[in-house]
């Protein structure tokens, strides 16, 4: 509908001798007295046209032409807003599109022929996934689903580092716990991994090898076994949340020598040096960001010879460009806020278009019970573990709670609320709307022999009450909500929208008798219910949650 209104406005502008701008904004007024849709086009063009905004709005409105069955009237409000009032018949007839398109409703070909990569989770295999990583995982998965709904060919990638000091400490931790299983007295350093999962890995080693590895001083075997065990645990946790990846990129590749005799990391250093952005002092190699107006340069290679996080991150992003991704989406935790701008600047210097990169930063998560901050894990040395949260509230509640607040906002995860079986719980409220419709349709089949073939679009003209029209109009918003969520990388917009649809449906269900209504009205209201169920299903699919048929 919004596209239709925009096209009409463009024609009206041309008829008025005004070149239409590239973007025309159509919004839904919060107050229904100002119509079903509104545009500020006269306000945005007034200065350019050297006219009073309200006068310009009247001129544009006079040139607007619509098919008679679509727009009932237009009005001018305030300083120059043009408001559109749709005909009730058009709203309800348009609902047919929802069921005609079914699972495809809301999908577009916007990204057809374009490749997108979404990197998310990317936790190194040093321990179980934490709740904080879980929020980023759900956010990334939903963003990937949104992009796929718009026709993009999406690669879901997990970037990890199985080298470096932390992996060495992991291997040492497992070896010491293994020796403990062998009956040796050990001194376990405070600097090593304290989690019970280390003892679990060591116990499995002992169960398989007995004391055979006691004399093994090399850490490679312990490291490999620990990495395999932890990665299996990570993948299992993600699977529980319906999260998967298409590829796993090992940072180790960035240290391997290529055909030109240099590694990707070395090539980045050479290219930045050639551009004049490398300095060597204090025994380290620096990215000269002071030339970019920053207070300090940023270290790329430490005096120990070990690279900082920035160097492989830059090299890794170069591979994304080389793999011809037109959309590069990074889902990071708040701890990356200070680092990623340097990566963007380096890529710009290297000649890559930074506009192809979009970064979604998700803020921290705290879990609360009865208003008190709690730690989900009871196991020694473990932070708040994602598995423990899933065990407590379930996968659907975990996913939806992670994204029901803006990614830019700190999330207070109310564990008790997530477990409630009442409308206070937004997850229950959403899923109950779907289950309620399923139960209604089943009852209609049993009591009145209802089948979907009974429904004709002409019956929808019988629906004109405010509750019916508001629900019908909301269903038609679904494609635009998806587009907005994609532009903003904000699945929360989907959650808000679906909650609004559920709210409207529950109200419609209470105020508009369905099975007891006259036959034609009954069928029309069942039609509207089925369309609502379809929108909820399509939205749930993008958000990665189930659509229960009974609750």
Curated annotation (Swiss-Prot):
GO terms for cellular component: cytoplasm. Keywords: Aminoacyl-tRNA synthetase, ATP-binding, Cytoplasm, Ligase, Nucleotide-binding, Protein biosynthesis. GO terms for molecular function: arginine-tRNA ligase activity; ATP binding. Signal peptide: none annotated. Pfam families: Arg_tRNA_synt_N (PF03485), DALR_1 (PF05746), tRNA-synt_1d (PF00750). It catalyses: tRNA(Arg) + L-arginine + ATP = L-arginyl-tRNA(Arg) + AMP + diphosphate. It comes from Prosthecochloris aestuarii (strain DSM 271 / SK 413). Belongs to the class-I aminoacyl-tRNA synthetase family. Monomer. Its main location: cytoplasm. This is Arginine--tRNA ligase. CDD domains: ArgRS_core (cd00671). It is found in: Cytoplasm. Gene3D superfamilies: Arginyl tRNA synthetase N-terminal domain, HUPs, Isoleucyl-tRNA Synthetase, Domain 1. A motif ('HIGH' region) lies at residues 123-133. SMART domains: Arg_tRNA_synt_N (SM01016), DALR_1 (SM00836). GO terms for biological process: arginyl-tRNA aminoacylation. InterPro entries: Arg-tRNA-ligase, Arg-tRNA-synth_N, Arg-tRNA-synth_N_sf, ArgRS_core, DALR_anticod-bd, Rossmann-like_a/b/a_fold, tRNAsynth_Ia_anticodon-bd. Its EC number is 6.1.1.19.
């Amino acid at each position: 509908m919004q596209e239709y209104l925009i096209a009409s406005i463009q024609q009206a502008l041309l008829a008025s001798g005004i070149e239409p701008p590239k973007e025309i904004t159509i919004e839904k007024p919060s107050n229904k007295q100002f119509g079903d849709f509104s545009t500020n086009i006269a306000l945005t063009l007034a200065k350019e046209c050297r006219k009073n905004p309200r006068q310009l709005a009247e001129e544009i409105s006079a040139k607007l032409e619509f098919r008679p069955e679509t727009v009932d009237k237009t009005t001018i409000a305030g300083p120059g807003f043009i408001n559109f009032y749709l005909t009730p018949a058009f709203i309800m007839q348009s609902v047919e599109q929802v069921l005609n398109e079914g699972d495809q409703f809301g999908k577009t070909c916007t990204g057809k022929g374009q490749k997108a990569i979404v990197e998310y989770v990317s936790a190194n295999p040093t321990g179980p996934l934490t709740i904080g990583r879980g929020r980023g995982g759900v956010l990334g998965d939903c963003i990937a689903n949104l992009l796929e709904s718009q026709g993009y060919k999406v690669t879901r990638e997990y970037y990890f580092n199985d080298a470096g000091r932390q992996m060495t400490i992991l291997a040492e931790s497992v070896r010491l716990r293994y020796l403990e299983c062998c009956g040796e007295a050990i001194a376990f350093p405070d600097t090593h991994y304290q989690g019970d999962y280390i003892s679990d890995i060591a116990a499995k080693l002992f169960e398989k090898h007995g004391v055979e590895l006691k004399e093994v001083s090399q850490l490679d075997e312990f490291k490999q076994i620990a990495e395999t065990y932890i990665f299996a645990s990570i993948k299992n946790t993600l699977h529980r949340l319906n999260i998967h990846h298409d590829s796993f990129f090992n940072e180790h590749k960035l240290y391997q020598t290529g055909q030109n005799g240099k590694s990707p990391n070395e090539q980045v250093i050479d290219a930045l040096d050639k551009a004049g952005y490398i300095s060597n002092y204090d025994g380290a190699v620096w990215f000269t960001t002071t030339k970019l107006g920053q207070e300090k340069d940023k270290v790329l290679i430490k005096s120990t010879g070990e690279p900082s996080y920035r160097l492989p991150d830059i090299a890794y992003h170069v591979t994304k460009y080389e793999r011809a991704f037109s959309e590069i989406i990074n889902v990071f935790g708040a701890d990356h806020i200070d680092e990623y701008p340097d990566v963007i600047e380096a890529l710009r210097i290297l000649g890559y278009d930074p506009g192809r990169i979009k970064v979604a930063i998700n803020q921290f998560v705290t879990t609360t019970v009865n208003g008190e901050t709690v730690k989900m894990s009871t196991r020694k040395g473990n932070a708040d573990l994602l598995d423990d949260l899933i065990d407590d509230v379930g996968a659907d509640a975990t996913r939806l709670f992670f994204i029901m607040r803006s990614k830019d906002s700190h999330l207070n995860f109310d564990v008790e609320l997530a477990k409630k079986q009442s409308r206070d719980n937004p997850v229950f409220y959403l899923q109950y709307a779907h289950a309620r419709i399923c139960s209604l349709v089943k009852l209609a089949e049993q009591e009145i022999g209802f089948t979907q073939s009974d429904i004709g679009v002409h019956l929808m003209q019988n629906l004109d009450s405010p509750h019916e029209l508001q629900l019908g109009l909301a269903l038609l918003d679904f494609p635009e909500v998806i587009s907005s969520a994609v532009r903003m990388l904000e699945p929360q917009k989907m959650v808000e929208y679906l909650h609004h649809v559920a709210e409207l449906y529950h109200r419609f269900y209470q105020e508009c008798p369905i099975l007891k209504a006259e036959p034609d009205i009954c069928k029309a209201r069942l039609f509207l219910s089925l369309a609502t169920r379809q929108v909820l299903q399509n939205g749930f699919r993008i958000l990665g949650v189930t659509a229960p048929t009974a609750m």
